[in-house]
């Protein structure tokens, strides 16, 4: 019988009295559950991405809300068919989001609901800012959004300076969004520090917008940091037309792969035809490389893990094991 799973996205900014104790309690709880996750906890809060068998996911949500430090956490839920993380990862991370500079998160932009966000988009009065990385917005974004060509969140402080130079901060209203909302908590605070007076952030991010409003003013798919890689923002509208193209032949494609060449591992967009002919590689050069991991259409575009070693590495390890087992 097919089991139902949940994918959960959630975060909480606020004081955590003993993050290491919380980490230990999480790990202990998960030993009895069919789950996988990537959860970071620090003195400033929690940032969680989680997948689990539905009863276990519901048990975890109830348990976390009973924890004194996390009583107000909000979960965004997607229905999935299997766990989407390779393992259970719960660890301490001082920066829940790697911005690279400190900001006063007690002063943030105004949180607006998906319904309010949709109305403001129709007014077409604000600068709509995507605060995700370029490979994320390449496959999906809001109509008429400003799309910074940035590869990591650490580049955004410098972009904030540029934004303040290109637009009059005191008279330019800004609406910002990210996947689940946590990056906006920091970036809205940063823009306020730069002098912007009217800053709005989409409460719950694109995930919450999709759950409440459907596709609405969104184009394409949503990049997610798990085995799914890309999802429609609303389960009721799965057949979304791609807005991006295959990097090899230029036909429409919104499917990301990691290059099968171990020494490259580049994240790239590719169509089914090209990914098959290139043996899972991002270029002809990589397809001829000596250390290529085995690609198969059956595994789809799931990211390669440590277990997906190329034959050359496997052979080397086997030889070393055989050598170690030789009598002296």
Swiss-Prot record:
The UniProt entry, under SMART domains, shows: RHOD
Q: Which organism is it from?
A: Chlamydia muridarum (strain MoPn / Nigg)
| The reaction(s) this protein catalyses | uridine(34) in tRNA + AH2 + O2 = 5-hydroxyuridine(34) in tRNA + A + H2O
Which residues are in the Rhodanese domain?
A: 122-218
Among Pfam families, the record links this protein to:
Rhodanese, Rhodanese_C, UPF0176_N
Entry EC number(s):
1.14.-.-
MF terms in GO: oxidoreductase activity, acting on paired donors, with incorporation or reduction of molecular oxygen
Q: Does the record carry Oxidoreductase as a key word?
A: yes
Q: Which residues form the active site?
A: 178 (cysteine persulfide intermediate)
- Briefly, what is this protein's role? Catalyzes oxygen-dependent 5-hydroxyuridine (ho5U) modification at position 34 in tRNAs.
Source species taxonomy: Bacteria, Pseudomonadati, Chlamydiota, Chlamydiia, Chlamydiales
Q: Which one GO biological process term can you cite for this protein?
A: tRNA modification
Q: Which gene encodes it?
A: trhO
Q: What is this protein called?
A: tRNA uridine(34) hydroxylase
Q: Which family does it belong to?
A: Belongs to the TrhO family.
What are the protein's UniProt keywords?
Answer: Oxidoreductase, tRNA processing
């Amino acid at each position: 019988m097919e089991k139902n799973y949940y994918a959960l996205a959630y975060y909480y900014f606020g004081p955590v009295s003993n993050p290491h104790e919380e980490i230990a309690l999480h790990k202990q709880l998960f030993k009895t559950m069919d789950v996988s996750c990537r959860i970071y906890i620090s003195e400033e809060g929690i940032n969680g991405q989680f997948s689990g068998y539905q009863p276990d996911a519901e048990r975890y949500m109830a348990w976390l809300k009973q924890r004194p430090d996390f009583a107000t956490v909000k979960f965004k839920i997607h229905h999935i068919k299997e766990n989407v993380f390779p393992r259970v990862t719960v660890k301490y991370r001082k920066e829940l989001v790697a911005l690279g500079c400190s900001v006063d998160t007690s002063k943030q932009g105004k949180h607006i609901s998906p319904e309010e966000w949709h109305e403001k988009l129709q007014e077409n009065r604000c600068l709509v800012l995507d605060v995700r990385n370029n490979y994320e917005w390449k496959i999906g974004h809001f109509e008429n959004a400003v799309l910074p060509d940035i590869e990591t969140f650490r580049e955004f402080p410098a972009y904030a300076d540029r934004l303040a130079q290109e637009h009059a901060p005191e008279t330019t209203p800004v609406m910002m969004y990210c996947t689940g909302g946590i990056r906006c908590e920091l970036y809205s605070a940063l823009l306020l520090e730069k002098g912007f007076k009217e800053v709005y952030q989409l409460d719950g991010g694109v995930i919450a917008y999709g759950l409440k409003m459907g596709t609405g003013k969104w184009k394409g798919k949503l990049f997610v940091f798990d085995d799914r890689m890309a999802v429609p923002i609303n389960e009721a509208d799965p057949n979304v037309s791609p807005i991006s193209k295959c990097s090899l032949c230029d036909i429409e494609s919104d499917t990301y792969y990691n290059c099968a060449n171990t020494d490259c591992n580049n994240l790239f967009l590719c169509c089914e035809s090209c990914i098959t002919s290139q043996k899972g590689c991002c270029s002809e050069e990589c397809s001829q490389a000596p250390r290529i991991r085995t690609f198969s259409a059956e595994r789809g575009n799931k990211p390669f893990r440590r277990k997906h070693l190329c034959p050359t590495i496997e052979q080397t390890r086997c030889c070393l094991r055989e050598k170690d087992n030789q009598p002296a």
